[in-house]
């Protein structure tokens, strides 16, 4: 009987070894692009972006589109937007249809402004000429374009014009040390000439500190959204503030450290003497409300309209906005000019303490430190705070891409 049991166990073990889990070796983002040679009469800037659907056009994509449109306008070059992740919705076609012609990858056209959906690209080729210039934002679009250009040069003998790499964060940091980390990093090291456009000088300096070099480098600085600026300039010499804390809350984006904020607040609610008088709101991404204990809850208001965002900025006394990245992110800057006393974090060479007096930039971002500093802020609450414009470059700069004339000479 004992030998029978041993035999059954050995057999079961062998079966388990035979049934190994299938490996998933695919990196979905890098489904290849394929180019075919075509003739085109003029220089054309090709922007590779995931999507132009309204629900996706904010933050990085919005900034890239703004630069792309200004670059095309000031150089006089033709425009083509290639959509690599999401096909355009009817709403997107309606929005862009007056200025752009929508084409399939197989179609050639001399229209001066084109949009080509290319998310469904297996076995499909896009026409490319020696006058095409590629601009990408997002490491996977850079990777795929760079590899496609290498294959195109081998096949047709046409080397690409300098790439425009629109860099809005250190993207390897979006992942653990892994395949995607290395692929993102490799996109900065491609052998072809690249013009790097950095979203902030802080980000450019971080790349330099870490040994990355490009043939040409430019940086632009953040500027306050025009609608927020209008609301800011309508405010008087003082702002009425509530006992209210505004969080930049994006649980779905790890680099915004939402769980760390929650951990700090769960300590703070037991430290603040007048805790019953305070309310906490989270803006940026819709999520369920979070119970902090001691009768306090984080109320999620999701993604607000610009008017709604301006209103909550005006009335909030304190804020927390974290970013585990060398990029400053916009919310702490926006909060600070609306006289919100905001806690943020340093990261490598990033330190926002000199932006204005409303920013508290912490080197130690542990929950104990954050909760202690938040209590100090809240203990100093006053219902009216003085308001004046101290960051005029941030609020009023109408020419953030002033270097475009130099880029034209490189293309």
Task: Name each model feature, range by range.
Residues 132, 314-327:
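Acidic donor-binding loop of glycosyltransferase active sites
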Residues 365, 379-411:
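A charged, aromatic-enriched C-terminal amphipathic alpha-helix characteristic of glycosyltransferases
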Residues 341-345:
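Short hydrophobic beta-strand element within catalytic cores of glycosyltransferases
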Residues 169-171, 202, 219-230:
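Short beta-strand->alpha-helix junction loop in the catalytic core
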Residues 144-145, 174-175, 180, 192-216:
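A short, active-site helix/loop in glycosyltransferases that binds the activated sugar's phosphate group
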Residues 24-36, 93-188:
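Extended catalytic core of nucleotide-activated donor transferases of GT-like folds
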Residues 60-63, 181, 190, 195, ...:
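Conserved catalytic-core segment of nucleotide-activated headgroup transferases in glycan assembly
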